[in-house]
């Protein structure tokens, strides 16, 4: 694993020197530790400690894969059935695949897809048969903050969004959240890093937030200070969701 650790170290050093571009592929280690700790605890009874096993872990904006590897580190090399990731940037996608292999993850133990999460262009996730719909025990994500997107009219009927509504074009934060939440198992845990604005912005975001709260899906909100990320100085939060 020393080779993998060295690779992660170099990615971190590169992120530190590349400023705003770093946000596209790197989650600082300390924040990664918090997320991986949360999703590996027993979701119904966190005090009992770490789950014995996770059948599947997903990061739909996986960057270099560091978050997924952190979850694996906590569960042990045989504690996860399969690791899934998705990444839009082809260079970063290749970084993630290399990162997995250098950490000793066999190519049969992970699947990383190069594609657009919001467009949901991964065939595996487009399964229409409810009995075969993929779902994950743990979902972690650090998606791009306040990403501008262009949802078409058909997107309002998308199974991921239709019960909550569409996030505004100016900020896809809740679109990313709802994408992940849709694929979370009933007993699973999702932890996502988002800008603080998702907690108080109005309009469509307020409606989505209110429904999530009223339905009891927001388990925990963890506020974090500003200047934790290389890519932005804004304060962020971790939202923990359960079904």
Regions found by a protein language model. Give the residues of each.
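Long recognition/docking surfaces used for binding and targeting
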Residues: 1-19
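Conserved S-adenosyl-L-methionine
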Residues: 24-141, 146-148, 153-155, 160-162, ...
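Short, solvent-exposed loop/turn segments at the edges of secondary structure
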Residues: 78-79, 232-234
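A short acidic, glycine-rich active-site loop
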Residues: 162-169
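Short glycine-dipeptide loop
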Residues: 184-189
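Short, solvent-exposed loop/turn elements at beta->coil junctions and helix N-caps
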Residues: 224-229
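Conserved beta strand-loop-helix elements of the APE1-like EEP
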Residues: 236-243
